[in-house]
Amino acid sequence: MDGDEASLVANFCAITNSTPEKAQEYLSVADGDLSTAITLFFESGGVTDVQSSYIEAPSQTEPVEEIRAPIAPTREVLVDPLADMSAGTSIMGNNFGFGGFPRMNRRQRRRMGIFDQSPSQIPFPSSNTEDSSEESDSSSRASRLAKLFRPPYDIISNLSLDEARIEASSQKRWILVNLQTSTSFECQVLNRDLWKDESVKEVIRAHFLFLQLLDDEEPGMEFKRFYPVRSTPHIAILDPRTGERVKEWSKSFTPADFVIALNDFLEGCTLDETSGRKNPLGAKSQKPVEAMSEDEQMHKAIAASLGNGNSTTESQGESSSQQAESHGVADDTVHKIDSAECDAEEPSPGPNVTRIQIRMPNGARFIRRFSLTDPVSKVYAYVKGVAEGADKQPFSLTFQRKSLWTSLDSTIKEAGIQNTALQFEFQ
């Protein structure tokens, strides 16, 4: 035994209080490393037969080292595929700000509804990983709901109330306002069932400027400050000249009923000052005679006595004569129309098919589908077949106070009576 080995044995014995023989055994197993040999000695409980003790120790006394399982991979959607992307922009374009989200002006910032409807939805590339399948199923369901209840952005005007009044006045169109609550399912049903109907859209495009407002955003709150609203959804028609609310509804409509309601309004009101139809604001009524001063009564009497009575009588006579002649021609023309000209079966609904309502004097209504290419005479033929007495007595059909007998050879589309309500009157 050399000096180094003797020193190791002595140190081992001093620390472990064991014999030199045990020290040599443990040092031999530890390849002369004193620290390892001492550790082996205490872990084996000071067993003399270190060879067998060291070999058996791992399975008997030494605990098996536990290796922590790797962290499971997780995936999260950093950008919602239904994020509000403004139409007409691209991901690489300059209209996108920080993080890939589009820069939107004040009019485009619209809160999503309860189904995350957005003006446009730009699909993002999906990864070809196993985890993407579950996400795609959830995303597709959300996408279907968003599409189903999506607001009618194709007919909504992104204007403020003041801007809408200016625009509608220049175009001689009414302002149709729909006030909604973003979390109300009844409001979402309007988007799904009413505003997506093509017949409703057609009437709106022809006669109205359409605004859809949310009651918790500034344009909607401004509307409520000017016009009291009991509940939502709220639908109103505004006169663009004065801003007056001339018609309002707070109930649900079927598309057919709403088209009828709009046509009833258009039948009775006009923005054309030269028209003979009613102004919704009401004509200024003349002051009653008893409320006039003596001077006003005198001026009225003088004006009446000097009012060209003879010329007025002659003009009225000429007008009556012309009307009688016109009615005679119309009656003969309508009388020649055979009710058999109208097909027994209605055409199936489609893009080239419209619904026309006939309102009778007693309040009854007849509704039928016609092709847009059908002549107006076919509507007369239908009326002669369904209206009692129409095949024997002269009658007229009018739309917006204008008789349609002069348009008998025109198509329904050319006459502009698609999705309208016509007034029936016996002559």
From Swiss-Prot:
Entry-linked Pfam families: Thioredoxin_7 (PF13899), UBA_4 (PF14555), UBX (PF00789)
Q: Name one GO molecular function term.
A: ubiquitin binding
Q: Where is the PTM Phosphoserine found along the chain? A: S371
InterPro entries, sorted: Thioredoxin-like_sf (IPR036249), UAS (IPR006577), UBA-like_sf (IPR009060), Ubiquitin-like_domsf (IPR029071), UBX_7/2 (IPR017346), UBX_dom (IPR001012), UBX_domain-protein (IPR050730)
UniProt KW keywords:
Phosphoprotein, Ubl conjugation pathway
Ranges of Low complexity composition bias in the record: 311-326
> Which stretches make up the UBX domain?
349-425
GO biological process terms, alphabetically, are: proteasome-mediated ubiquitin-dependent protein catabolic process
Q: Does the keyword Heme apply?
A: no
Kindly give the SMART domains that the UniProt entry links to this protein. UAS, UBX
**Region annotation Disordered: residue ranges?**
115-143, 273-331
Q: Tell me which GO cellular component terms the UniProt record holds.
A: cytoplasm; nucleus
In UniProt terms, what function does this protein have? Involved in CDC48-dependent protein degradation through the ubiquitin/proteasome pathway.
Subunit comment for this entry?
Answer: Interacts with cdc48.
* Descriptive protein name: UBX domain-containing protein 2
Question: Which gene name does the record give?
Answer: ubx2
